[in-house]
């Protein structure tokens, strides 16, 4: 039985209002506030018309993680559009959900980079967010069976503001930009900010092996950890399940 991840009527505005003050700062500009109000109004209208919208918690990527806490940014496009899949984190699905092809390629790439590390059994990437990885889709909702159905409805204005807020933080971040859609967001990153920007194709099977910048073989996860170590910061444990105990520093360090 799929997890019920449907957005409920009259909950989206309240979720936005409950965001931590650090994120709220990105939503105060008049153009951003108008875009957010517009997309909320559209979604509420679609829900009233009987549409099924995912996920139940569109702002989950921002929960428990302030802009200053972010160490790595991974951008997705829009949520998975099937029942029980999207959970508000880019590329992530619940553990009991069938692993999507893009996530399968992400895990395969991680296993390639960290020799001897097993593929994760679970699909929920919450463990990454707890280490400072922001998993942000540029469109935060989608209708059942209709990919990109809420694109160009205002979400991009909102998420551009969130990305800009993170990029302006004084602490350098690593930005993993996979595919043309994510790479277009590089213009939001200030020059001379010290950020690490890594680009490759999207991990989808349609593009993961395509030259000139295939995702498979990109080395991004190890490069992020090497960059963090150079700055005296703890590397990201990309594999250990949350119930497996302590982080395996030997595998994910240098």
From Swiss-Prot:
<dbReference type="GO" id="GO:0004844">
    <property type="term" value="F:uracil DNA N-glycosylase activity"/>
</dbReference>
<comment type="similarity">
    <text>Belongs to the uracil-DNA glycosylase (UDG) superfamily. UNG family.</text>
</comment>
<dbReference type="GO" id="GO:0097510">
    <property type="term" value="P:base-excision repair, AP site formation via deaminated base removal"/>
</dbReference>
<dbReference type="InterPro" id="IPR002043">
    <property type="entry name" value="UDG_fam1"/>
</dbReference>
<protein>
    <recommendedName>
        <fullName>Uracil-DNA glycosylase</fullName>
        <ecNumber>3.2.2.27</ecNumber>
    </recommendedName>
</protein>
<keyword id="KW-0378">Hydrolase</keyword>
<comment type="function">
    <text>Excises uracil residues from the DNA which can arise as a result of misincorporation of dUMP residues by DNA polymerase or due to deamination of cytosine.</text>
</comment>
<keyword id="KW-0234">DNA repair</keyword>
<dbReference type="InterPro" id="IPR036895">
    <property type="entry name" value="Uracil-DNA_glycosylase-like_sf"/>
</dbReference>
<dbReference type="Pfam" id="PF03167">
    <property type="entry name" value="UDG"/>
</dbReference>
<dbReference type="InterPro" id="IPR005122">
    <property type="entry name" value="Uracil-DNA_glycosylase-like"/>
</dbReference>
<keyword id="KW-0227">DNA damage</keyword>
<dbReference type="InterPro" id="IPR018085">
    <property type="entry name" value="Ura-DNA_Glyclase_AS"/>
</dbReference>
<keyword id="KW-0963">Cytoplasm</keyword>
<feature type="active site" description="Proton acceptor">
    <location>
        <position position="78"/>
    </location>
</feature>
<dbReference type="GO" id="GO:0005737">
    <property type="term" value="C:cytoplasm"/>
</dbReference>
């Amino acid at each position: 039985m799929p997890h019920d991840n449907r957005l409920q009527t009259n909950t989206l505005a309240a979720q936005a209002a409950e965001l931590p003050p650090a994120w709220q700062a990105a939503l105060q500009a008049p153009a951003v506030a108008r875009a957010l109000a517009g997309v909320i109004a559209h979604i509420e209208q679609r829900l009233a018309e009987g549409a099924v919208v995912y996920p139940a918690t569109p702002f989950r990527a921002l929960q428990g993680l302030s802009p200053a806490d972010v160490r790595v940014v991974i951008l997705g496009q829009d949520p998975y559009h099937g029942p029980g899949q999207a959970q508000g984190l880019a590329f992530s699905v619940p553990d009991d959900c069938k692993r999507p092809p893009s996530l399968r390629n992400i895990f395969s790439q991680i296993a390639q980079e960290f020799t001897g590390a097993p593929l994760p059994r679970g699909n929920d990437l919450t463990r990454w967010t707890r280490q400072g990885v922001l998993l942000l889709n540029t469109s935060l909702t989608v209708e059942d069976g209709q990919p990109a159905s809420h694109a160009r409805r205002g979400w991009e204005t909102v998420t551009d503001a969130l990305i800009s807020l993170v990029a302006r933080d004084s602490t350098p971040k690593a930005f993993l930009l996979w595919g043309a859609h994510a790479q277009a967001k590089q213009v939001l990153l200030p020059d001379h900010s010290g950020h690490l920007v890594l680009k490759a194709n999207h991990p989808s099977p349609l593009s993961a092996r395509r030259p000139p910048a295939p995702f498979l073989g990109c080395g991004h996860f190890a490069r992020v950890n090497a960059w963090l170590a150079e700055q005296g910061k703890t590397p990201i444990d990309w594999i250990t399940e949350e119930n497996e105990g302590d982080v395996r520093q030997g595998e994910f360090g240098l």
